Amino acid sequence: KKQVKLTIGIPTYNGEQFLKEKITSILNQDFTDFELIISDNGSTDATKEICSNFAIKDKRIRFFSHKKNLGAVWNFDFILKKACGEYFMWTAVDDKILPGFYEKNIEILEKNSNVVCSASQVKYFGKNRNYWVERSTRGYFKALKKKMVKRFQNLQNYPVSGTFQSKFRYYLKLRGHHHMFYGMYRTEQLKKIWLLDVNFTE
């Protein structure tokens, strides 16, 4: 199979509420050299029907439907093993990706050969957005920052020396920075160091 520039993976379970908007937003991006892998982890809603209909209409979509739920980590791993793109990223079914995201992150990776991952800032949207804004005005995030100083120091002291693999493993084990997990990686390198013993539940 001809290699595409980017593999985008959506692991999902009962995601019918978000799937149509999510898939449409990806297909409508200006960047087109990608494959979209959707792995349905035994959903009981209309997820399978929605994804199947999209896959029929667009050959860039590869849809896999599993009869039972095999766990979230298994689903992430399944998608990575199927990836054919030079670059790779998982994306949550309820996240939105703004225009230009793919091009900007690919450019960063191509200009910086030893960068572990290229990620973006996160903005809240939807019905919970005002909840987070209100909490921030009450000093919630200032208090949280004090409690998280030790955790954030792990990121601030991120190693700049060492092998690509060692830095990659360090990055994947960071706690409290889940949005960066959904950044963009080099597929070949990620497959080399990706291990299911990386504990995502700690």
Place the predicted regions along the sequence by residue.
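Nucleotide-sugar donor-binding/catalytic module of glycosyltransferases
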Residues: 1-202
